Amino acid sequence: MSAPKKVVLAYSGGLDTSIILKWLQTEYGCEVVTFTADLGQGEELEPAREKAVMLGIKPENIFIEDVREEFVRDFVFPMFRANALYEGLYLLGTSIARPLIAKRLVEIAAQTGADAVAHGATGKGNDQVRFELTAYALDPAIKVIAPWREWDLTSRTKLLEFAEQNQIPIAKNKRGEAPFSVDANLLHTSSEGRVLENPGEEAPDYVYQRTVDPEKAPDAPEFVEIAFEKGDAVAINGEAMSPATILTKLNELGGKHGVGRLDLVENRFVGMKSRGIYETPGGTILLEAHRGIEQITLDSGAGHLKDSIMPRYAELIYNGFWYSPEREMLQALIDKSQEHVTGTVRVKLYKGFARTVARWSEHSLYSEKHVTFEEDAGAYDQKDAAGFIRLNALRLKLIATRNARVKG
């Protein structure tokens, strides 16, 4: 395969991706286009433009985009309709961001006439898979460059030497190795590596950046009401908001009350186990509220089927198959289930917990007259239960009779 002439790089403006940018220029002799996404990570992104210009990137080849609304509307919300949890715990904050970044890389490549895209994911992690599966799903002819799998800059010392040799500025706090690596977006903050690599030791307090220590959270609970339409949150405390604004507000409330902390050892797609500290305050509240509204609006058969496919759906997202036909098939089923998931949920926030305390909906299947302990005015004839039990017990009785006969 011939060397690429123009490459679109997923660029943060940080030291590592700046080194990658210069490496692409020197190793491939190619023109580089940079793409920097505002996913709600809380960083000022204009310095990325300045750094790219300093490294020789043409102004017209610098793309900095606010994709927060698209991220929440088209990726986070569809995933939350499924109540997706990887291995029963992880809310997939990193996993769900990668398809959007990779999609934009491919789109910008088409727009600028680039023949390759590049990312800064290492050869040990899941992100390399997520970026590349998305790229190939959207453009089978695209070339993907993964510098961490190609170069010989295998230590922090070598990276810093390369930076110095190529006049890449190194902030003082980057001279030493960071105690852990951080990835953040509007859904979560994840921390991994170094001081966190021993799963037998509790994570230091300074690792947590988005949530207060639950023990130090306010002593008084706070209540928040979240309104849903067809499975998606549309308002908080009666105020209609955009998807990204809703998640931002829930992050603020959850972080204040220490909601959404997770210390997890997970199974990476590439075969190893890794330990991560995740903070997902708004997402944890949203998941609790969505489950709450489904409790009264979703039929038991549909709900149980939906629950049974959730682990597979979550695994597909974790492993990078957002644009696969099987994920899209499951999404169609999940979205169908949400047609009546409309109503409001009240959630109590208190010292690390988010708990549904009330829910109501015009689409509710909950019938108080059927479940009441008082007189139900003939709504339910308890005698009907006898035949129901006899029919369901028939096969169990036949099995027991057979077993007794065989043993006898």
UniProtKB/Swiss-Prot annotation:
Keywords annotated in UniProt: Amino-acid biosynthesis, Arginine biosynthesis, ATP-binding, Cytoplasm, Ligase, Nucleotide-binding
Subcellular location: Cytoplasm
Lineage of source species: Bacteria, Pseudomonadati, Pseudomonadota, Alphaproteobacteria, Rhodobacterales
GO biological process: argininosuccinate metabolic process; L-arginine biosynthetic process; urea cycle
Keyword field contains rRNA-binding: no
Domain of life from the UniProt record: Bacteria
Molecular function, one GO term: argininosuccinate synthase activity
Protein name: Argininosuccinate synthase
Quaternary organization: Homotetramer.
Annotated EC: 6.3.4.5
NCBIfam families reported in the protein's UniProt record: argG, PRK00509.1
Catalytic activity as recorded in UniProt: L-citrulline + L-aspartate + ATP = 2-(N(omega)-L-arginino)succinate + AMP + diphosphate + H(+)
Pathway: Amino-acid biosynthesis; L-arginine biosynthesis; L-arginine from L-ornithine and carbamoyl phosphate: step 2/3
Annotated positions binding ATP: A10, Y11, S12, G13, G14, L15, D16, T17, S18, A37, G120
Coiled coil: none
Gene3D superfamilies: Argininosuccinate synthetase, chain A, domain 2, HUPs, Single helix bin
Family annotation (InterPro entries): Arginosuc_syn_C, Arginosuc_syn_N, Arginosuc_synth, Arginosuc_synth_CS, Arginosuc_synth_type_1_subfam, AS_cat/multimer_dom_body, Rossmann-like_a/b/a_fold
Organism annotation: Cereibacter sphaeroides (strain ATCC 17023 / DSM 158 / JCM 6121 / CCUG 31486 / LMG 2827 / NBRC 12203 / NCIMB 8253 / ATH 2.4.1.)
An example Gene Ontology CC term for this record: cytoplasm
SUPFAM superfamilies in alphabetical order: Adenine nucleotide alpha hydrolases-like, Argininosuccinate synthetase, C-terminal domain
Residues given in the record as L-citrulline binding sites: Y90, S95, N126, R130, S181, S190, E266, Y278
